[in-house]
């Protein structure tokens, strides 16, 4: 049905899928992905639910599909784009996070050897803006950074959370705003001391995660020179 007037978007959401090993059988994996629809209200796509599939890997690099398109967690709400996962403190299981747009809640899901378990909607003590963005988890799993490009606003609002990998809980740590392009990504240093992000399609900034005011700690470490 593809034509000049109909475009096959596929899965159009940044950070909209993740693959995790099955904690009960390492020859299998879970694929977590979004169900998104074009939303004329905001001129882009909105995620209304998350789905799961499970695959069995073979030694010849082929795989079998065990199941697909199984919903989990809340449905018919408006999710922010990112879904992120961090390993449980037990070293085996996984916590999954997906934020609910324009609310004070995120969806918490546990993946253990018996499957995916909805742990409900959790209030991190912070209103989640009505926008879209990207997120990342630090290498050692201690922090989550998420940025929101607010509809009709040129600023990127960046929020930091401490992660309790035993309970899966997020605790608000700090936030700042940055004039930027739409949806820049984030990267942590291996030590988790520094966070990096870009602005205005030209500048690369470094932030000190140990600072009392993370936003005020920014240092320009790179600038686009046209190659």
Where are these regions (language model features)?
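Structural signature of eukaryotic scaffold interfaces centered on beta-propeller domains
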Residues: 8-28, 38, 74-93, 131-140, ...
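Extracellular distal adhesion/interaction modules in secreted or cell-surface proteins
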Residues: 1-10, 29, 34, 39-41, ...
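Beta-propeller domains
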Residues: 89-207
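Asp-box/WD-like beta-propeller blade repeats and closely related beta-sheet repeat scaffolds
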Residues: 34-101, 123-128
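Beta-strand initiation motifs
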Residues: 1, 57-72, 112-123, 165-174, ...
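Conserved blade-ending motifs and adjacent loop-strand segments that build the rim/top face
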Residues: 176-187, 214-227
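Short, solvent-exposed loop/turn segments at conserved positions within beta-propeller repeat blades
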Residues: 1-12, 39-48, 100-103, 151-156, ...
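First exposed extracellular module after export/assembly in secreted or surface-exposed proteins
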Residues: 10-16, 23-30, 36, 47-51, ...
């Amino acid at each position: 049905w593809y034509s000049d007037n109909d475009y096959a978007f596929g899965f159009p959401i940044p950070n909209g899928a993740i693959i995790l090993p099955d904690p009960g059988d390492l020859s299998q994996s879970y694929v977590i992905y979004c169900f998104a629809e074009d939303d004329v209200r905001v001129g882009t796509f909105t995620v209304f639910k998350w789905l799961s599939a499970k695959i069995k890997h073979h030694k010849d690099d082929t795989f079998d599909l065990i199941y697909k398109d199984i919903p989990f967690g809340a449905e018919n709400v408006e999710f922010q784009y990112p879904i992120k996962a961090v390993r449980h403190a037990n070293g085996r299981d996984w916590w999954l996070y997906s934020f609910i747009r324009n609310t004070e809640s995120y969806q918490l899901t546990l993946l253990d050897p018996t499957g995916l378990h909805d742990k409900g909607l959790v209030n991190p003590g912070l209103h989640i803006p009505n926008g879209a963005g990207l997120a990342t988890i630090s290498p050692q799993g201690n922090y989550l950074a998420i940025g929101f490009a607010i509809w009709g606003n040129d600023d990127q609002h960046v929020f930091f959370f401490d992660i309790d990998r035993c309970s899966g809980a997020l605790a608000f740590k700090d936030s700042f705003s940055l004039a930027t392009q739409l949806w820049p990504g984030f990267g942590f240093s291996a030590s988790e001391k520094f966070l990096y992000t870009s602005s205005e399609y030209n500048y690369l900034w470094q932030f000190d995660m140990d600072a009392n005011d993370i936003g005020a700690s920014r240092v320009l470490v790179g600038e686009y020179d046209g190659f």
